[in-house]
Amino acid sequence: MDVGSADAFDRMGTLGVEEEFFVVDDSGQPTAGIQELIYDYNHPPAGVLADRLDHELFQFVIETQTPLLEDVSAVSESVQAVRDALVTHAADHGYRIAAAGLHPTAKWRERNHVEKPRYQSQLDRIQYPQHRNTTAGLHVHVGVDDPDAATWIANELRWYLPPLLALSANSPYWNGFDTGLASARAKIFEALPNTGMPTRFEDFEAYYQLEKRMVETGSIKDRGELWYDVRPHTGHGTVEVRTPDAQADPSVTVAIVEYIHALVMDFAARYADGESGTKVRREILDANKWHAMRYGRDAEFIIPGSMETVTLSEFVDRETNRLGVDGLTTLLAREGGAKKQRRLHASDNIDTLLESLCLDTDT
């Protein structure tokens, strides 16, 4: 039975970053490339990519993982090193790498799924929602050395996830058309079972029992199929945030990762001080997430226990002052990903848009 353990939670403040990317051809169009990039035993992933490169559901979606990072100061260098290695590895096989929450022109009916048994099982069981799941995300792991603390922190993080989604939203196009959303990826992904905003868990045992029950009843094959926006990762001993869209610009990834790390560390200290935590209705959290995926940078978010809302700008100002991190301010001052994609598409053409998503371009 593939479930985790409370014993996994034995490190505090460590980091791991998982980024999902698209394999594309010279023009930026999606193409199947995992066979060569992952399974070419004459030219396998090496160096920082060794054992840290894997495919996702579709043959044009690939994932990287950083090494375990002991300190947040190592994030920028590590993320860049992994990306540089991936771009070089792809180029050696005749491919390029692109990133966004969704590839604007990828039509899921025309793309092939991988043949890995785990994914084939999901396709058979979940059917349509998984068959169309061409999404790519950014997943951030922060180590927590106490399982109950990790569960409490995951509970508290939930209200902060919609603003994070709004900041990262860059997937307005899906299947070749404009969805009208800032993050269509978030909407498409939450059509899968066991996704979206999780409920509040009383303690680690409550989460663990859910994980165990879901596996034992055959609702999921393994713990990894609890795809919530945030979860205590019972294998890695981390709090894992899975909300953001994937990013082409590494500085955006780094800003998001640094903020999540600061947020987790702040909540860890508050848990140690005996704070009781914030109770907020799931419906409010879902409404805030909808605002983020629909409006992106223009979203407003309902404040727990209040009739008031906060704008994204107000949220960023508050968090920057509270936690002493300035990456969000820099990120907010830049053009949002969804807006940029629409501008490039409208003012130029699809080729310019696709080029802007490639990791080896300065566009």
Swiss-Prot record:
Catalytic activity: L-cysteine + L-glutamate + ATP = gamma-L-glutamyl-L-cysteine + ADP + phosphate + H(+)
Highest taxon listed in the record's lineage: Archaea
Entry's transmembrane regions: none
InterPro entries: GCL_type2/YbdK_subfam (IPR050141), GCS2 (IPR006336), Gln_synth/guanido_kin_cat_dom (IPR014746), YbdK (IPR011793)
Enzyme class: ligase
Family, similarity comment: Belongs to the glutamate--cysteine ligase type 2 family. YbdK subfamily.
Stated name of the protein: Glutamate--cysteine ligase
Source organism: Haloquadratum walsbyi (strain DSM 16790 / HBSQ001)
